[in-house]
From Swiss-Prot:
Species of origin: Pan paniscus
SUPFAM superfamilies: beta-beta-alpha zinc fingers (SSF57667), Retrovirus capsid dimerization domain-like (SSF47353)
Gene: ZSCAN12
Gene Ontology molecular-function annotations: DNA-binding transcription factor activity, RNA polymerase II-specific; RNA polymerase II cis-regulatory region sequence-specific DNA binding; zinc ion binding
Start-end of Basic and acidic residues biased regions: 213-230
Domain of life of the source: Eukaryota
Name of the protein described by the UniProt record: Zinc finger and SCAN domain-containing protein 12
CDD domains documented for this protein: SCAN
A cellular-component GO term for this protein: nucleus
Family: Belongs to the krueppel C2H2-type zinc-finger protein family.
Record region (Disordered): 154-175, 201-258
Amino acid sequence: MASTWAIQAHMDQDEPLEVKIEEEKYTTRQDWDLRKNNTHSREVFRQYFRQFCYQETSGPREALSRLRELCHQWLRPETHTKEQILELLVLEQFLTILPEELQAWVQEQHPESGEEVVTVLEDLERELDEPGEQVSAHTGEQEMFLQETVRLRKEGEPSMSLQSMKAQPKYESPELESQQEQVLDVETGNEYGNLKQEVSEEMEPHGNTSSKFENDMSKSARCGETREPEEITEEPSACSREDKQPTCDENGVSLTENSDHTEHQRICPGEESYGCDYCGKTFSQHSHLIEHQRIHTGDRPYKCEECGKAFRGRTVLIRHKIIHTGEKPYKCNECGKAFGRWSALNQHQRLHTGEKHYHCNDCGKAFSQKAGLFHHIKIHTRDKPYQCTHCNKSFSRRSILTQHQGVHTGAKPYECNECGKAFVYNSSLVSHQEIHHKEKCYQCKECGKSFSQSGLIQHQRIHTGEKPYKCDVCEKAFIQRTSLTEHQRIHTGERPYKCDKCGKAFTQRSVLTEHQRIHTGERPYKCDECGNAFRGITSLIQHQRIHTGEKPYQCDECGKAFRQRKKTSYKEILLKNHSEPQAGVNLLLSSLIPEWQSCFRKDL
């Protein structure tokens, strides 16, 4: 239904002034001219736009349509420039932040711009004998002076706005009240009397409602809810004319520059949005839509000059470049660790505060980061979507798969800046780097060797004899978890490390590396005493015991010491389990490769 809004008002000296806006069609040329040219109708349309209630419409589409119509009738974009519309918005907000007493005074002057408001206020300050001090709340002499000044200034000027009439304070003095009504009759009687305006009971009487309360009335107030006017302080220093930042008229968001106002208004209701032709998603800014559409088109126009990686948005590229520059502007106040992103610092600080906002619904475990919860959930779902193409082993996280693939490819992307040693895993590099930092070195009290904190814990098990990691198949125990993992490959037959030269496979990467030196002839480990070189570090350590005389392996029976640990023969395995022959056989078979196991089991 195409409808417009007419204005009806009635002036009566014997009763308080009330205003009602009724919905009806423009039926006369006079009404149309009023809508186009009259500044008072613009003020009424502004009020109605601000006080519009969603419940007055049949649905969201009609509500949006009416809001647009009222906004057009108020701001008139067909006749006003962007600068003029912006000035109207700033003027409205400026009048809103003024104290109530000054609002009534200023609006009676009917200013057309913010500069006129400043001029009016400065004139008032000069007329009062207290420069720089704004009018205080309802003192008798100042009230009389202000009213007399209002009357003198308004005589002979054009008509007064509805907003001013409605906001006019009601005073106890009958004489002042009579003078005020006479002024209103002179200024508004001719113009508004011709419009056949009638009094409404829905709006507040002009003597009971302040201008500020009317300007700030929320839409919910017109739907039956009430809100108390804000308390007015005597020294509104926060409302300085020079320092006040512009704010959004819809939601009160502060804006740093006036130019931000127009751009921000697109987010507010009633403004046109930009929709994606592919998925229908809408955006408040055209630039955001263009960047979003690159998801569908695959366009990545922003390319990194360092590594050639391309991105859809400029901000993502700028964030990426921090990787190359090494810039880390965000520093933790607790431990001094720096980060390239503020979000990364925010997540890191939760380690110090102990905040864990993300909880698992299955087991209740909490995490400080959303990514941690996401990966943890896969434990319950047993989801392992990332599979290795070399050995078909599956993983729950892509990062773990990437690190695992380094086992097959031989890639060691994590290199120590101090000594150049490379590692497959980042955690291994972190542990290694602690060796170079003296303040993080931990010395063994038994033998004096230095380790990282985790390395010292594992090393001390050599002296204590603790072996917490036990094999479920043969019950053999180990000091380190990695040693247990490597040992279990004996039972499973898994040999993930394969030589490219001869095809021989191994259970441990270190053994493969040492084996490959047979083909290359490389002997990187050299003895400082005699110059002998070896392919593996263990061979060098065993050799150096010849020079040092160290014999760490001692016989439990006779106490004799040896430089090397004697390998247990198959016969000794059976003899150790002579009380349980079958257990000895099973243990012996478990040490064989799977092909041999199947052959021997057939004969048993």
